[in-house]
């Protein structure tokens, strides 16, 4: 793994602080920039209030399995546009939940399903390499697409407008954003640094570059 990416990913692991991130910035951009950025990096994570929202864990069945998700939506409203929120390799942690709350405060029903639960708990790993090889690499794209379909159906039954569905995802979830934009009833997608290419396999038969021609959503 690239040394800079390794430092950055290591800093994102549960229990790691901003010191590792500052170290990575120093490696890449020089100590001067890192010193200037340190006060910003040291700030606490954003915590969006739940005032006026209904927020928390929900579940739905997909192919005989129970899938759990975090959802947030404006309280007492229906006909809401839906946003699927897809995490990076670390699963549905507090930042992902907060993204849902931010979207809900803006008038959306946001739902972030736990797409790794059948294979294990990403938060139980302390090393990125082990997390990737022992858990992430074992998650089939077909399973992920089905779970996202289930999340959409749940949203439609709980105040969401299925004519207004969007998806956003981070890193691993960015790749999934591209794939689901070609698979599901999506009007728009926003992929944050998602992987576009890769080796085809039984679990990951296609990558975003392979389905680019059939993407219809912006």
Regions flagged by a language model, labelled:
Residues 18-26, 33-47:
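N-terminal twin-arginine translocation
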Residues 199-218:
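The feature captures the conserved acid-bearing segment of alpha/beta-hydrolase catalytic domains
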Residues 79-88:
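Short beta-strand element of the alpha/beta-hydrolase
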Residues 94-113, 117-118:
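Short amphipathic alpha-helix adjacent to the substrate-entry channel of hydrolases
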Residues 1-19:
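N-terminal secretory signal peptides
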Residues 169-173, 177:
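Gly/Ala-rich beta-loop-alpha elbow adjacent to hydrolase catalytic centers
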Residues 44-75:
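N-terminal cap/lid segment of alpha/beta-hydrolase-fold proteins
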Residues 126-168:
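Gly/Ser-rich "nucleophile elbow"/oxyanion-hole loop immediately N-terminal to the catalytic nucleophile
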């Amino acid at each position: 793994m690239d040394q800079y990416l390794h430092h950055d990913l290591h800093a994102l692991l549960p229990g790691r602080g901003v010191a590792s991130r500052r170290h990575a910035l120093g490696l890449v951009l020089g100590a001067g920039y890192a010193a200037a950025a340190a006060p910003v990096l040291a700030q606490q994570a954003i915590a969006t209030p739940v005032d006026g929202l209904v927020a928390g864990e929900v579940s739905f069945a997909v192919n005989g399995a129970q899938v759990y998700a975090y959802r947030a939506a404006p309280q007492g409203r229906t006909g809401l546009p839906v946003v699927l929120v897809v995490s990076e390799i670390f699963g549905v942690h507090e930042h992902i939940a907060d993204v849902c709350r931010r979207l809900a405060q803006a008038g959306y029903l946001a739902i972030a399903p736990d797409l790794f639960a059948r294979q294990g708990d990403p938060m139980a790993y302390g090393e990125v390499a082990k997390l990737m090889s022992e858990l992430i690499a074992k998650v089939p794209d077909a399973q992920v697409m089905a779970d996202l379909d289930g999340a959409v159906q749940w949203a439609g039954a709980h105040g969401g407008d299925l004519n207004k569905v969007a998806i956003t995802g981070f890193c691993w979830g960015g790749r999934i954003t591209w794939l689901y934009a070609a698979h599901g009833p999506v009007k728009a997608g926003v992929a944050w640094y998602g992987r576009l290419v890769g080796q085809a396999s039984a679990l990951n038969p296609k990558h975003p570059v392979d389905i680019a021609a059939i993407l219809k959503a912006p």
